[in-house]
């Protein structure tokens, strides 16, 4: 178990009665850059008094999960009003780390000693369990990665955006940069974490950056990614077309394609057919979210099969060229979509 545990570190941020928030403890260690980012994310350091009990995000391939608690009397923590328990890990699993974070928070509230947190952390790293009669138990085996992938609702997204969902699907398929805005972090995280399910064949949640600030270091790290889904609570992000191809305003239920991306995102009959299939499947009250994801995935598979059939030989090793696509006389939007999809799937001869 020790060799495969994806957890990287555990840390503590405390807010004292003077209103100061300080990074007070960490095990084993984290970089100064990551510590600065986590202080920004924990909701104890800003002017805003809104406390977010749980947030998660990603920075340079490290996932962070922050559980924040108000200190209740009586407690072993004197002069502390709130604290954040910060876990970093290599895997995406909000439910797993929220549950473990709650257990460690109760432990710290009771004993006020980081050594007790370290005991629980090491127990999970080595044995996959952290058991306590008073503070609750946690078992790693209860939290499957696939469950985390399927936790959001595709049906809710389609219900909100209808046929415009095809813009999201196209952007994700072509590995475009999708930026999402909502002022409430909880709504933002719920929506953004669901988007990668539209491209289930990749099962790649590393594209997800659900909680971003308009901070230089964060934006530079984001720009280094090929395609992504990034969530912002600051509407000023709309004035940064250099970081998005598709902009989603969740409050207004509006999806905007950036001018520079309109050509590669041109829609045709193929897109209309896919859009109708998505809307029809998601609108069926008898279908679960899992079933809708399967329907979308099946359609994706059909498109990828068409793409694979365009390869000049049958060994699957040769690449598709623009000339091959032109020979097929596809309508321009379909040709463009297949061309850029071949590039995204690394099937294109450049």
Predicted regions located by residue number:
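Acidic, Ser/Thr/Pro/Gly-enriched alpha-helical scaffold modules and adjacent low-complexity linkers
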Residues: 2-350
């Amino acid at each position: 178990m020790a060799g495969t545990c994806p957890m990287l570190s555990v840390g503590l941020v405390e807010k004292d009665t003077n209103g100061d928030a300080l990074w007070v403890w960490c095990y084993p260690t984290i970089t100064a850059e990551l510590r600065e980012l986590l202080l920004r994310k924990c909701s104890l350091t800003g002017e805003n008094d809104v406390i977010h009990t749980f947030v998660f995000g990603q920075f340079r391939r490290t996932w962070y999960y922050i559980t924040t608690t108000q200190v209740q009397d009586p407690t072993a923590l004197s002069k502390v009003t709130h604290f954040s328990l910060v876990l970093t890990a290599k895997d995406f699993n909000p439910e797993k780390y929220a549950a473990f974070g709650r257990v460690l928070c109760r432990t710290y509230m009771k004993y006020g000693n980081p050594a007790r947190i370290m005991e629980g952390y090491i127990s999970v790293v080595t044995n996959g369990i952290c058991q306590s009669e008073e503070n609750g138990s946690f078992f790693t085996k209860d939290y499957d990665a696939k469950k985390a992938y399927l936790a959001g609702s595709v049906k809710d997204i389609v219900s909100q955006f209808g046929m415009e969902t095809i813009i999201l699907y196209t952007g994700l398929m072509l590995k475009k940069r999708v930026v999402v805005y909502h002022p409430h972090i909880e709504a933002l995280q719920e929506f953004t974490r669901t988007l990668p399910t539209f491209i289930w064949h990749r099962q790649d949640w590393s594209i997800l950056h659900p909680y971003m600030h308009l901070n230089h270091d964060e934006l530079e790290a984001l720009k280094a990614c090929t395609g992504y889904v990034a969530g912002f609570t600051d509407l000023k992000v709309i004035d940064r077309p250099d970081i998005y191809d598709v902009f989603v305003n969740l409050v207004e239920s509006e999806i905007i394609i950036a001018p520079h991306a309109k050509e590669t995102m041109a829609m045709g009959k193929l897109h209309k057919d896919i859009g109708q299939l998505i809307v029809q499947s998601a609108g069926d009250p008898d279908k679960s979210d899992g079933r809708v994801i399967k329907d979308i995935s099946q359609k994706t598979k059909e498109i990828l099969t068409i793409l694979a059939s365009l390869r000049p030989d049958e060994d699957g090793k040769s690449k598709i060229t623009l000339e091959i696509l032109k020979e097929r006389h596809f309508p321009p939007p379909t040709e463009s979509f297949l061309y850029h999809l071949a590039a995204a799937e690394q099937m294109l001869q450049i």
